[in-house]
Structure formats: C-alpha cells, structure tokens
C-alpha cells in the first residue's frame, strides 16, 4: 500500500505560513517597519498605494545586508536575531522567527535593494511567489528598500477577503502609529497615494504623541513615572474630562514593543474609578520596561500578547502609579461627590441664607457699677401679635351636622363620574414612566414606547432621507468651530466628507489634524458637534461598508444614536405627544435602526388577566 503522507513543496508551505504572518496589508507594513528598526535605521519612509493592496514600500538608512545575507533572508527560519532557544527569553529585537520575509515573498511580488556602508555596490533582488526572478548588483545608497506589489496575487480567495480601502488604510495607520510611538528617536514619514499623511521628526515621547494625535492632545496629558525592581513605568495618561467612548488612544509598550493586555487595561480603568462618565475610555501611552527574562513574547503570531512572570505585581504597581499621577496633578477628586451633604443641614434651614448678626454696644455699661443701677440701654425683642385662635373658625357654621340626615348614593355618583360621554370627550394623554417609557392609552388597551429607541428610528429615517436626496438643511454658525482629530480619524473624515455634507455639515477647511465647521445639521447643536463626529468616526472605524448606500446607512445610524434622547431624560407632555406622532409617521416604526423593539401593546384582556378578572 502506497504512502499517503507527503512533504509539501516549499512554496506551498510558505503560503500556509503566510496565512499566520500576513493577514492583510497592515501585517506587511508591521514586519517591514520592524526589520528597518532592527537594522538600526534613523530615518524610515513608508509608501503605500490603494491601502497597500497595490504597493507597499519601506525605505530605511540602516546598516543594510551583504550579498549572501540578501539572498538568505528570504529563506524560512533564517534570522540574525537569535542563535539558540535560550535567546527567546533574552530578546532585544523586534523580529526573531525568521519567517516574515519568506511569508511575504510567497504571496506577493517583492523587490529588494540593499547596500552596506562599507560596500561600493549593493544588491538588487526580485522574487515573485517564492521564485527568484533575478539578482543583480546596483549602485545604491546605504540602507534597504523593500517593495511589495500585488499582495495575494496567487491566492485570489485571500485577496477577496480584504476590506475596503478605508478599512485597510486604517489598519495600516494603526500599525504605523504603534511603531512610531515606540521609537520616538526615529524620523518616520508616511505617504499614501502620493499624499503625505505623517511626517514625524525625531523628538521626545510627548512631542511624538502630539505630532500624531494633533496639537490639542498636549493639554490632555498627565505624566506618569514609577521605578521599581521589577518594573519601570514612564509615559502619559489622559485627563478624565477628555475621555472618549472609543478605545483609539490606548497604548501599552513593553520593552518598546506594542502589546495588548486586557489585564493591564483593567488596572488602568480601576485607577480611574469614579472619575469617568459611563462608557468613557481614558487615553494612555504607557512604556513599561521589564527584565527580558521575565516575559515570554513567543506565544502569538503577531507578538502582541506577552506572558508575564508576576502579573499581579505589575497590576498593583500600574494601578498605584496611575492613581498617584492623577492625584499629584490635581486630577483626582479630593471630596466624596457621592455623599449627600444635605444630610448635614436641618431641613428647616436648607433653603435659608446665612445672615450677618447685628451687634449693639451699650456705651454706658460699667462692669464695676452696682447691679441695681439700671443701664440706659434697653433691649426690646420684636414681637408680633398672633391672631386669636377663634379667628381660625370665622365663617364656619357652628350648627352641628347630623350625619344621620345625610344620604349617599354611590351608584348615582359612580355612573355620573365615569359616564360614556365624558370618557369620549376626555383628551388623549401620555405619561412618562421612570424617564424611560412613554405610555399612551389606545382603544384596545395601552401603548408602551421606549423613548430612546423611538427617537433613534425617527432621526435615522430623517438623516437617511437627507443623505440620499442631498437636500439637508444647515444652520450657519456665527463663529466657525474648530475640532481636532488624529491622523487616522482625519483620513476617514476626508473619505466621507461628501456624505457628511449631505447631512448638513458645512466644512470651511480640512487641515492635517483639524476641521473647521461653519454649518451644522438643524438637529445638531454647536455643543453636540464634537460628540456627533467623534461617535460617527468611531463607529465607521470599526467597519466601513464598501457600498455607498451602506455607508450612508451607517452614518445615519451613528448620528441617530448620538442625538437621540437618552434614557433618564425628562420629556414634557408636548414632547411625548410629538415623539409618538413622529414615530408612527416612520416607515418602520416597530423597530429601531439597530433592530430593537420600539414599542409594545398591552391589551385590556392582558390587564384583566393580571387582575384575575
């Protein structure tokens, strides 16, 4: 019987390995940037076209490679970073597995140019799908240039799974920002489709953060520093009042490597307890230095998860350092805001203002005079004549009432009180329960409406109509409003600018890290502008639909969610009636934009069952 187990060809094995290393264009960007850093580069350029699907190029001024190394670097498990297994627990470089370049070369067209400083000529290599096409010498500057074209050209199924350019570009920017924040001593530039998105000169940590996330970020930062035997912490945390609903500006770096840790994030959130609004997320840029032998990086293909020897100690130190920084810079409250101070004041004095007492001095007073001598000073307390108690009963008939002579006709009273004619003439009235539900009587029973979901449905259909027909009304602002966003967010706003204008936004200018708004949709107040746009950008960053209609739909949903009346908001009776009427004027009144029930009906039969009638 013939054997059925066979060794896979190298190019097939490389494609399988590429599935773990290269998931999308951002994965290629991450690997190439880290290789440039390991090469000792002080200047790194990143160039992309069509969100990396067509072209990704990384150019550095590092030490370069020899002719032999240039060819060997594309072999699997070929690396200059480690020599033995023990080196995995004493890592000082970004890469160490030696499979990134082999994986990239297996699923793309790769062109590499490299030259060492002491060499006169460099090496030029072209590889297509793991196959060496050519290797030549060339006149090159010191450093290395990797050009990756047509990603997943030989795996159509993987290419079809890529998201829209906006989404893929967002992932690339995320990776670029993480690397740039971890290495503020390196000059980074990033170009996309010929436009410069980032130009980050060498600087300190604070300036690097400001250069990436706009100038307004500087006033939001609180420095943090702590040094212990097992952990050193440096960086910045955000002031609570600037916390957002999204988790965009949260970064942990361990030994200059970006990581994700829900455990350490919980320590930060614990330190902010009582300082944040519900659902708000603080920003933080924290650099943790630990001995390399106390962590294990080799547990995840992307190296974003790390195993610590003593997580509990790190948790306690990080939480304590964060609380200390918040208190040191007068961010943490010094009063207990949950205490009801009205309990300290007698009820009868709660609404009274303090009065300065009047002091009268007797100039003739002599303590050595005999007590029998009367002073000229006299004090007469002010008295008011109280009405005689009998006046309380003036006008009352003193004649006794004979209860026996009174008759009660309960049936007659009941029938007149609830007569059919009066019930029909009574106006329809709405009631608000717990500032959450609106109850409206109907012929068959009662209608119970969720006010937040109902308002979301109303606003959603209004915004969707305005976006579709491009006839939204705008309110012009007397003074333009400037809002600041990160580079990642600004790239997204540039892409959806036309759709935003169709909702009623009027942009006076779109700068590198800010926008100037001169007009708003009629349903958006000036104070709500930043909230609406932040929520919109946050929602679209999660997943930007490919089709234009789906993008409009997502925008309408996001704006409706931001502007809808919230649970816990008191509504006047007029507002309740308007909400009910507008809800049933919608095309899909039964559900919210997020497919949640907007109202339920409770019939008379249901009420009878409750009362066991």
Curated annotation (Swiss-Prot):
Hydrolase among keywords: no
Alphabetical UniProt keywords: DNA damage, DNA repair
This protein's GO CC annotations: mismatch repair complex
Gene Ontology molecular function: any one: ATP-dependent DNA damage sensor activity
Disulfide bonds: none
BP term (GO), one: mismatch repair
NCBIfam families, per the entry: mutl
Sequence similarity: Belongs to the DNA mismatch repair MutL/HexB family.
Name of the protein in its database record: DNA mismatch repair protein MutL
Organism: Flavobacterium psychrophilum (strain ATCC 49511 / DSM 21280 / CIP 103535 / JIP02/86)
Lineage of the organism: Bacteria, Pseudomonadati, Bacteroidota, Flavobacteriia, Flavobacteriales
């Amino acid at each position: 019987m013939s054997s059925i187990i066979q060794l896979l060809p190298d190019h097939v094995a490389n494609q399988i390995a590429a599935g773990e290393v290269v998931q999308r264009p951002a994965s290629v960007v991450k690997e190439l940037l880290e290789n440039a850093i390991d090469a000792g580069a002080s200047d790194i350029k990143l160039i992309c076209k069509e969100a990396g699907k067509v072209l990704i190029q990384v150019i550095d001024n590092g030490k370069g490679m020899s002719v032999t190394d240039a060819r060997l670097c594309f072999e699997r498990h070929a690396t200059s970073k480690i020599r033995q297994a023990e080196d995995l627990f004493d890592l000082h470089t970004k890469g160490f597995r030696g499979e990134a370049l082999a994986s990239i070369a297996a699923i793309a067209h790769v062109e590499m140019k490299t030259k060492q400083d002491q060499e006169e000529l460099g090496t030029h290599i072209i590889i297509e799908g793991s196959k060496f096409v050519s290797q030549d010498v060339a006149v090159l500057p010191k450093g290395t240039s990797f050009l990756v074209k047509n990603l997943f050209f030989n795996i159509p199924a993987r290419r079809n799974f890529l998201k829209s350019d906006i989404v893929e570009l967002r992932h690339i920017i995320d990776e670029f920002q993480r690397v740039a924040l971890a290495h503020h001593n390196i000059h980074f530039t990033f170009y996309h489709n010929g436009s410069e998105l980032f130009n980050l000169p060498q600087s300190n940590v604070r300036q690097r953060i400001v250069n990436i996330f706009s100038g307004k970020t500087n006033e939001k930062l609180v420095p943090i520093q702590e040094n212990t035997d097992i952990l050193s912490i440096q960086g910045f945390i955000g002031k609570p009042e600037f916390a957002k609903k999204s988790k965009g500006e949260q970064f942990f770096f361990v030994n200059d490597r970006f990581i994700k840790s829900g455990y350490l994030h919980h320590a930060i959130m614990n330190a902010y307890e009582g300082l944040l609004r519900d659902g708000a997320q603080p920003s933080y840029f924290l650099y943790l230095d630990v001995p390399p032998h106390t962590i294990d990086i080799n547990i995840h293909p992307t190296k974003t998860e790390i195993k610590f020897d003593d997580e509990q100690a790190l948790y306690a130190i990080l939480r304590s350092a964060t609380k200390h920084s918040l208190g040191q810079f007068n961010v943490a409250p010094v009063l207990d805001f949950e205490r009801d101070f009205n309990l300290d004041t007698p009820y009868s004095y709660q609404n009274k203002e303090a009065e300065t007492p009047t002091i009268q001095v007797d100039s003739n007073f002599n303590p050595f005079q005999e007590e029998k001598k009367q002073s000229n000073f006299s004090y007469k307390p002010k008295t008011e004549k109280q009405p005689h108690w009998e006046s309380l009963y003036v006008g009352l008939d003193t004649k006794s009432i004979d209860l026996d002579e009174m008759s009660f006709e309960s049936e007659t009273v009941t029938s007149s009180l609830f007569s059919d004619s009066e019930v029909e003439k009574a106006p329809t009235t709405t009631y608000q329960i717990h500032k959450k539900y609106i109850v409206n009587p109907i012929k068959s029973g009662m209608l119970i409406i969720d006010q937040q979901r109902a308002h979301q449905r109303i606003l959603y259909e209004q915004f969707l109509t305005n976006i579709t027909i491009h006839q939204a009304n705008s309110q012009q602002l007397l003074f333009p409003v400037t809002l600041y966003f990160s580079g990642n967010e600004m790239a997204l706003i540039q892409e959806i600018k036309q759709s935003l204008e169709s909702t009623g936004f009027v942009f006076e200018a779109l700068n590198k890290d800010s926008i100037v708004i001169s007009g708003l949709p009629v349903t958006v107040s000036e104070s709500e502008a930043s909230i609406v746009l932040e929520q919109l950008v946050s929602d679209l960053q999660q997943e930007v639909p490919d089709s234009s209609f789906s993008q409009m739909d997502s925008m309408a949903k996001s704006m409706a969610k931001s502007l809808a009346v919230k649970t816990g908001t008191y509504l006047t009776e007029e507002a309740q009636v308007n909400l009910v009427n507008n809800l049933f004027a919608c095309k899909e009144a039964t559900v919210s934009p997020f497919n949640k029930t907007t109202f339920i009906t409770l019939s008379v039969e249901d009420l009878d069952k409750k009362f066991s009638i």
